[in-house]
Regions:
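Compact, glycine-rich, soluble single-domain proteins
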Residues: 1-80
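Conserved G1/Walker A P-loop phosphate-binding module
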Residues: 90-173
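Conserved C-terminal guanine-recognition region of P-loop GTPase G domains, centered on the G4
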Residues: 158-160, 183-252
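Canonical P-loop GTPase G-domain recognition
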Residues: 232-287
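Long, well-ordered amphipathic alpha-helical subdomains in the mid-to-C-terminal portions
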Residues: 282-359, 363-373
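Interfacial loop/helix-cap signal at membrane boundaries in integral membrane proteins
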Residues: 347-381, 386-396, 430-472
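Membrane-interface helix starts
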Residues: 387, 399-409, 514
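Membrane-embedded alpha-helical segments and adjacent helix-loop junctions characteristic
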Residues: 421-516
Length: 524
């Protein structure tokens, strides 16, 4: 039985994940791994794609991809995701942690005036841009990463001119699946920031920690910012911050970027770890005894074989070893291994696959999610569904419903165009036209009274005011349309449009994600 055949509301355990290449690795990174429990929430109005719940969060999958995933249907849950119910309510320690919860720096700070560079990394929709704005204020530089159209934003931390924070694109892993992931990985590996600020959505820790584990493997000083803690605690959730620090080996700071709470403490930690180069205290997430220790032995053996190559290529050893086992061809190219080394590593990986009972990519992903589950069980009490989320789910039933999604979309777009071209936009357009006409009349009388040459007079009145004025008359329409479409995008409606329009757009060679690009074309 495949995942495509699973009915709405039914649960199953994933047995195998088909496919190959970067797309399959992307699914594994998102938690679609053998042994994981998955529940079908709904199908798009056109029947494709489908929305799933896995590891406590929602995921959208096309039916063609779901057809490559075999499952075993179950009647009860097999994995617990509720987290601990009685966690330690310890007081969060002070600056630098004094080496209590992660490896303390050697006490030799970087030279004075050294520019402290930071990579701000996190999943999409975790509040990363809000935090970046809180850190840098209005002092930002916006551009593109070299060779791609991915936006790049840089700016110094307010009050600290010798710092520079780079806001990397929102990503879910450091695998080379999308241009955003490639750009982010290359920035960390090649630009070598002094430290990483990893922002996590506290209401969805399980999903966010996968990227955190990959960042820890890069052996760069790092501080974790638990964002949206106000929502977490406001809905009866909590996090044992000290316990999480002890398990991750890096400082963890609870914040609310939207309310500017905890940001000052985050800045102090970020400055401290960068200045003293306090590297993560943990990079080994697989137990020697777990599943016979097959993955543990393989990672350490591969690390030993590639140590010199990784150092020469400037790639963190643990990260390189994990990526080689996963089959990351870009990392393999950079290491420049000879044929004998390739054969030795392949022998180790094949042996691990036999002992573990999973293929190489799935074994590494499963190792990470097993550790994440342990962290959440020991340190996290998941919040209850907030009133906002319950209200959002009710609205979703209408906006993405089988029989209501398309009519709602047509109705909303008609309303937007009506308000733009006949109400708000038209009113502002008439107001601007009246202003231009009034200014033109005043200027006309002034030029006539001054006896200005007729040619110059005609150029100003008939050329500038009439010509430029007619072009400017479109500005209110454009601004109004931009406002409404931005409102739709910020509210999350465009993402919902991508969900139910994906099948239709693919018939003309596009994907559902292009709905946001079509949105931009409307703005133009």
């Amino acid at each position: 039985m495949t995942l495509k055949e699973l009915e709405i509301g039914k649960s199953a355990v994933i047995k195998t994940v088909g496919g190959e290449g970067a797309l399959r690795q992307h699914f594994l990174d998102m938690g679609v791994i053998p042994g994981a429990e998955v529940t079908v929430i709904k199908f798009a109005p056109m029947g494709d794609p489908m929305e799933l719940q896995i590891h406590g969060y929602e995921l959208t999958l096309r039916l063609a991809d779901a057809d490559q995933i075999t499952i075993e249907q179950i009647s009860s849950r097999t994995r617990k995701h509720e987290g601990a119910r009685n966690i330690n309510q310890s007081v969060h320690p002070g600056l630098g942690e004094e080496g209590k919860y992660h490896v303390k720096g050697d006490g030799n700070p970087l030279p004075e005036k050294t520019r402290l560079t930071y990579a701000l990394v996190g999943n999409q929709n975790c509040g990363k841009t809000t935090l970046f704005n809180q850190l840098t204020g209005s002092n930002q530089h916006i551009g593109n990463f070299p060779g791609v159209t991915v936006d790049r934003k840089d700016g110094p931390i307010k009050g600290y001119p010798d710092t520079l924070v780079t806001d990397l694109p929102g990503i879910y892993s450091m695998s080379p699946y999308s241009s955003e992931e490639i750009v982010s990985r290359n920035f960390v590996l090649e630009d070598k920031p002094k430290a990483i600020i990893n922002i996590i959505d506290a209401t969805n820790i399980e999903r966010n920690l996968y990227l955190t584990m990959q960042l820890l493997e890069m052996d760069i000083p790092m501080v974790v910012a638990l964002n949206m803690m106000d929502e977490m605690t406001g809905n009866s959730g909590s996090v044992d911050v000290n316990g999480m620090e002890a398990m991750l080996g890096v400082p963890v700071v609870p914040i609310s970027a939207a309310k500017n709470e905890g940001v000052d403490e985050l800045v102090r930690h970020a400055l401290h770890i960068a200045k003293y180069q306090e590297r993560p205290g943990r990079q080994d997430f697989c137990s020697e005894n777990e599943f016979g220790g097959a993955v543990h032995r393989c990672i350490h053996a591969v690390s030993h074989l590639i140590e010199d190559h990784a150092e020469h290529a400037g790639i963190p050893l643990r990260f390189a070893a994990s990526k080689i086992i996963e089959g990351d061809h870009l990392i393999l190219q950079k290491l420049e291994l000879d044929e004998n080394e390739h054969e030795a590593i392949e022998h180790l990986i094949v042996q691990m696959e036999k002992e573990r009972g999973l293929d190489r990519s799935a074994a590494i992903a499963d190792m990470r999610f097993n550790f994440i589950e342990k962290v959440c069980e020991k340190t996290v009490v998941k919040p209850k569904a907030s009133r906002e989320r319950i209200r959002s789910e009710k609205i979703d039933r209408i906006l993405t419903g089988k029989y209501t999604a398309i009519p709602c979309f047509i109705g909303i777009m008609l309303l937007v165009f009506f308000l733009t071209f006949h109400v708000i936009g038209a009113f502002l357009q008439n107001l601007l036209a009246m202003g231009i006409d009034a200014l033109s009349n005043v200027t006309d009388r002034a030029l006539t009274a001054a006896g200005v040459n007729e040619v110059l007079h005609g150029l100003i009145i008939d050329g500038i005011f009439a010509g430029v004025g007619s072009v400017l008359s479109f500005l209110p329409i454009i601004v109004t349309l931009f406002f409404f479409l931005s409102l739709m995008e910020d509210s999350g409606y465009i993402a919902r449009v991508a969900f139910f329009m994906d099948k239709l757009l693919r018939k003309i060679g596009l994907s559902g994600r292009c709905s946001s690009d079509l949105d931009v074309q409307f703005r133009r």
